[in-house]
């Protein structure tokens, strides 16, 4: 199976966790896009969705799925999203698609976070994939200097603005042994909106696409 076929398999497998009549939290990226395709097939069974990006909102609306403002929803039954990396503790690096802040907000109000990914995203130690950090534009240089002090090599993601109007620094050269501590440390830097470490709030279930089918963890 190709990588895209593995992503499609886990996107459709996530339908098993969607309860009729609920509002579903939906992530961003190529794997989440397959979940939206799957969700379109049962759109009349759900109340709607909360979306983590303008791109996902547009795709949901193209299927006629109502999209709710996060402020109008107290709690979500599930949140389904991909990951750039996921370790054995169900901690993730996310934000390759620059939607990390909204993804983290939706994860916070969801009872269950379901990570959908192909097997290439499974790692022993987080950090080979550059760690995205969303930053207020005026703080970009300061935050970069602080990230260097932590041992990282930050790279400004050129020509990218988040849906919130901020910039992204991708931090290379990190071997993340204590993801919770690093998440808290980077989030404490003035000017950081959030870091793409999902460790304090990791995944509850991981659906991993493999050549032998979908592996369920959690």
From Swiss-Prot:
The UniProt record lists the keyword Nucleus: no
InterPro entries on file: NagB/RpiA_transferase-like (IPR037171), Ribose5P_isomerase_typA_subgr (IPR020672), Ribose5P_isomerase_type_A (IPR004788)
Superkingdom to which the source organism belongs: Bacteria
Catalytic activity from the UniProt record: aldehydo-D-ribose 5-phosphate = D-ribulose 5-phosphate
Pathway connected to this protein: Carbohydrate degradation; pentose phosphate pathway; D-ribose 5-phosphate from D-ribulose 5-phosphate (non-oxidative stage): step 1/1
SUPFAM superfamilies, per the entry: D-ribose-5-phosphate isomerase (RpiA), lid domain, NagB/RpiA/CoA transferase-like
Active-site annotation: 103 (proton acceptor)
Gene Ontology biological-process entries: D-ribose metabolic process; pentose-phosphate shunt, non-oxidative branch
Keywords annotated in UniProt: Isomerase
Gene Ontology CC annotation, any one: cytosol
CDD domains: RPI_A
EC number: 5.3.1.6
Task performed by this protein: Catalyzes the reversible conversion of ribose-5-phosphate to ribulose 5-phosphate.
Known partners and oligomeric status: Homodimer.
PANTHER family linked to this entry: RIBOSE-5-PHOSPHATE ISOMERASE (PTHR11934:SF0)
Family: Belongs to the ribose 5-phosphate isomerase family.
Protein known as: Ribose-5-phosphate isomerase A 1
